[in-house]
């Protein structure tokens, strides 16, 4: 009988339960499992960015279970700062190979390709001044960069943290894998959580910075945009951005290629593939592999707390920057621009534009701002990619 109990004790000692609850530092893994469950709750029950939070949350769950070698961070982050191909070949598993798409910067541009097939740039083409609102909303990126520097982060780390303010998860991942891959888990989780919380974060700032009269402004319908303009737009933008800022060319180029495929109407089959099947597959790979980087040993530290705080500051300042420029444009145009559309300059598409619409209708139920807000919203996508290119050019 004693031998049976001894065997049971040995089995328990080798189990994951013992590693979590009876080893030094095991509590960290329990905390991370709780965080993973919170992300899954937000994705499934609250439906906050479920397409990303669900795979990220499950990846976080898997990597913080006491399993042997689901993900080997030392393959990608080591003294040489290069992928250890020999170690990958000898010890790499499925997640390691999937993560190559993140490390090599493959997934974010492909996500942009898919986004391009679903994006309508007509509101931006019809009202080019929307570009200014999209640019103003990137203020949060550079403000947070300065804040991160003050807190002691390096230039590369500060740039990666700052890009959270663009409200663009793929761009944040793209920049972080280039500049500060050791912060990828924290930055990705912060970026996507705050993207999901745009309807919660933005309204108080929008109300605080605008008057009731400004929120009630009804904007005139934008002009009609010809098909020729829609086709020329992605081509011209790609040329200008690529020649001006080569480091942003891959993101902006893929975005514009996807849009050109859509607007040309001559490659309907691959347009649907890029916007549906390819986009869905890449989303699964990206979310799950990024979630697997959030191991308790590297995630639970003071840096993560600072990143989360800086991230919400970035969102707040970006929203405020867009609204304040919207107020200036309202003044200059003698009340023809509703300042609420400025908050849509962050590139959370289309959530930020929907928030502008909702706040406008609260002030005036007959006010429809969605199409007007989509201009700054899609301009913000371009703006965040350009900001990413600036950081990579400076610190890459």
Could you describe each region identified by the protein language model?
Residues 1-77, 90:
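N-terminal alpha-helical transmembrane segments of multi-pass membrane transport
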Residues 20-32, 83, 96-111, 155-165, ...:
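Structural signature of hydrophobic alpha-helical transmembrane segments
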Residues 39, 99-125, 258-261, 279-301:
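Hydrophobic transmembrane alpha-helices of secondary-active transporters
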Residues 104, 112-118, 133-143, 147, ...:
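Alpha-helical membrane segments and immediately flanking helix-loop junctions
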Residues 123-145, 295-322, 373-377:
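Entry/N-cap segments of selected transmembrane alpha helices
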Residues 182-200, 310-318, 341-344:
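Alpha-helical transmembrane segments
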Residues 193-266:
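Membrane-embedded hairpin module used as a gating/binding unit in multi-pass transport
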Residues 238-322:
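Transmembrane helical segments that form the transport core of multi-pass membrane transport proteins
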């Amino acid at each position: 009988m004693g031998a049976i109990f001894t065997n049971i004790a040995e089995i328990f000692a080798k189990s994951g339960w013992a590693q979590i609850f009876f080893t030094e530092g095991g509590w960290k893994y329990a905390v991370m499992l709780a965080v993973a469950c919170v992300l899954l709750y937000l994705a499934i029950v609250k439906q906050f960015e479920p397409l990303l939070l669900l795979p990220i949350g499950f990846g976080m769950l898997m990597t913080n279970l006491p399993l042997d070698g689901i993900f080997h961070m030392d393959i990608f982050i080591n003294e040489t700062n290069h992928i250890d191909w020999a170690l990958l070949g000898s010890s790499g598993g499925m997640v390691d190979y999937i993560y190559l798409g993140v490390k090599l910067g493959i997934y974010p541009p492909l996500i942009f390709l898919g986004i391009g097939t679903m994006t309508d740039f007509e509101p931006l083409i019809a009202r080019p001044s929307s570009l200014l609102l999209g640019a103003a909303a990137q203020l949060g990126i550079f403000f947070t960069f300065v804040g991160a520097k003050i807190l002691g982060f390096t230039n590369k780390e500060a740039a990666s943290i700052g890009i959270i303010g663009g409200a663009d998860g793929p761009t944040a991942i793209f920049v972080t894998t280039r500049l500060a891959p050791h912060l990828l888990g924290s930055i990705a989780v912060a970026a996507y959580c705050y993207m999901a919380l745009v309807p919660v974060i933005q309204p108080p700032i929008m109300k605080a910075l605008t008057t009731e009269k400004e929120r009630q402004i009804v904007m005139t319908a934008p002009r009609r945009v010809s098909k020729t303009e829609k086709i020329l737009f992605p081509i011209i933008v790609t040329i200008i951005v690529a020649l001006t800022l080569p480091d942003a060319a891959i993101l902006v180029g893929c975005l514009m290629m996807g849009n050109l495929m859509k607007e040309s109407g001559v490659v309907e089959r691959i347009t649907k593939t890029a916007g549906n099947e390819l986009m869905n597959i890449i989303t699964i790979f990206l979310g799950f592999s990024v979630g697997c980087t959030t191991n308790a040993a590297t995630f639970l530290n003071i840096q993560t707390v600072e990143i989360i705080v800086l991230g919400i500051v970035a969102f707040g300042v970006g929203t405020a920057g867009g609204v304040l420029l919207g107020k200036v444009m309202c003044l200059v145009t003698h009340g023809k621009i509703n300042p609420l559309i400025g908050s849509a300059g962050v590139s959370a598409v289309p959530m930020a534009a929907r928030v502008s619409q909702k706040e406008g209708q609260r002030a005036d139920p007959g006010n429809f701002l969605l199409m007007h807000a989509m201009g700054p919203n899609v301009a913000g996508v371009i703006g965040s990619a350009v900001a990413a290119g600036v950081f990579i050019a400076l610190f890459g």
